[in-house]
Amino acid sequence: MALKIRQIKGTVGRKQNQRDTLRSLGLKRIGQEVIREDNSVTRGMVHTVRHLVEVEEVAGE
């Protein structure tokens, strides 16, 4: 199982740790999508920026 993560809000005025988390996920701009492995590390990062991203589960990698 994998997660498709899309950035839906920008980082202006956000805390540094939230900006760093988006970068770690591979997101740089609004509308960008990445696919990441569904594990506890990724889930924790998504939780940190849950108000800035949209997440859906997809089959495969």
Swiss-Prot record:
Highest taxon above the source species: Bacteria
Molecular functions per Gene Ontology: structural constituent of ribosome
GO BP annotation list: translation
Keywords, comma-separated and alphabetical: Ribonucleoprotein, Ribosomal protein
InterPro entries: Ribo_uL30_ferredoxin-like_sf, Ribosomal_uL30_bac-type, Ribosomal_uL30_CS, Ribosomal_uL30_ferredoxin-like
Listed Pfam families: Ribosomal_L30
GO CC, any one term: cytosolic large ribosomal subunit
NCBIfam families cross-referenced by the UniProt entry: rpmD_bact
Family per similarity comment: Belongs to the universal ribosomal protein uL30 family.
Subunit structure: Part of the 50S ribosomal subunit.
Alphabetical list of PANTHER family matching this protein: LARGE RIBOSOMAL SUBUNIT PROTEIN UL30M, MITOCHONDRIAL RIBOSOMAL PROTEIN L30
Record-given protein name: Large ribosomal subunit protein uL30
UniProt source species: Corynebacterium urealyticum (strain ATCC 43042 / DSM 7109)
Gene designation per UniProt: rpmD
